Amino acid sequence: IKITYICIIMSKVNEEYLIKSLDNENNSGIENLSTRKIKAIKNDYLQQLQLSREELKDYHKKLKEYRTVDDLTNIQYGRYIRWINLKNPENICLTTGGVIIDIQLQDDGIYVLCKNFRNKRMKIKIDECFIFQKLTDQEKTILAALDYLEK
């Protein structure tokens, strides 16, 4: 009886959290996705880099809780991102990343200004990078529900 009661309470908490997550407008970009779709899109991006099998596995592991963002509508202030700079195809590497503190529209393109844990600021041009944004707990909750419904 005790275990059943705990499961009912946890189920109610998860239900309330899911409703709260769905009401959050910042999560609107995730509603048409699923974990499988996110992995497929991420894989398509990484395959374009023509990485070795081991490097590809390593990148997938490092980007497990991230999704690709390729337009301005999905990039959100205060979110943690990592990116791969495409300017030098001979030196492809995944950055440790930073938190988005500003988005700047300039004559030559759109730039994202980030700050890392050492307060170092970095400016990246959206058109020259593959950008991966870390999933929030709310987004993970929505994805879990969408994955369940997809079965």
Regions found by a protein language model. Name each.
Residues 1-9:
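Short, Lys/Arg-enriched N-terminal segments with co-localized hydrophobic residues
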Residues 106-116:
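Short, solvent-exposed secondary-structure boundary/capping segments
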Residues 41-76:
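Mixed-charge, Lys/Arg-rich low-complexity intrinsically disordered regions
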Residues 72-90:
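Short coil-to-beta transition motif at edge beta-strands of beta-rich domains
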Residues 12-18, 22-27, 117-151:
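Intrinsically disordered, low-complexity, charged/polar segments
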Residues 10-48:
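Extended boundary segments
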Residues 90-107:
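Short beta-strand-centered aromatic/proline hotspots
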